[in-house]
Design a protein with these regions (language model features):
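Alpha4 helix (beta4-alpha4-beta5 surface) of REC/receiver domains from two-component response regulators
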Residues: 63, 84-99
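Receiver (REC) domain active-site loop signature in two-component systems and cognate sites
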Residues: 56
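Active-site beta3 strand of CheY-like receiver
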Residues: 45-52
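Acidic catalytic/metal-coordinating carboxylates
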Residues: 33-34, 60-64
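The C-terminal output helix
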Residues: 115-131
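Two-component/phosphorelay signaling modules centered on CheY-like receiver
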Residues: 12-30
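C-terminal output helix
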Residues: 105-115
Length: 131
């Protein structure tokens, strides 16, 4: 079964194009229009990687990541944003994000970031299995 990638973005066009791109690369993908929708979904703890919009109405991508971490759910995260903010980028990468991409991004940016995220998640899972 392919790894599940969850895309959480309030922009319909970004969700649609990301879903198509990720699916064409052979991954399972689910899209959500808000952090709150993702939190209520049956896919909450099934995603192997999250692609999160930084700025969304309601809970932002970084807020969602912090909430998940506070609940013990560590999942690799790729942030996407329309606003280039080097300070926010540095902060999120320092805090463990796999990538921080500025829209519009393309497959040469997103797909390698997803591969890195899934590999980092796989290494973490193996470490937890040995405990």
């Amino acid at each position: 079964m392919p790894s599940l990638v969850a895309v959480i973005d309030d922009d319909h066009a970004v969700r649609e194009s990301s879903e198509s791109l990720i699916r064409s690369a052979g991954f399972a993908v689910r899209v959500f229009d808000s952090a709150e929708q993702f939190l209520k979904s049956p896919y909450l703890r099934k995603a192997a990687c999250l692609v999160l919009d930084v700025r969304m109405p309601g809970m932002s991508g970084p807020e969602l990541r912090r909430k998940l971490l506070s609940e013990g759910y560590e999942v690799p995260v790729i942030f996407i944003t329309a606003a280039a903010d080097e300070e926010a980028k540095a902060r999120e990468l320092t805090n463990g994000a796999v990538a921080y991409l500025t829209k519009p991004f393309d497959e040469k940016e997103l797909l390698p970031a997803i591969d890195r995220a899934l590999k980092s998640g796989s290494r973490r899972d193996h470490r937890e299995d040995r405990r």
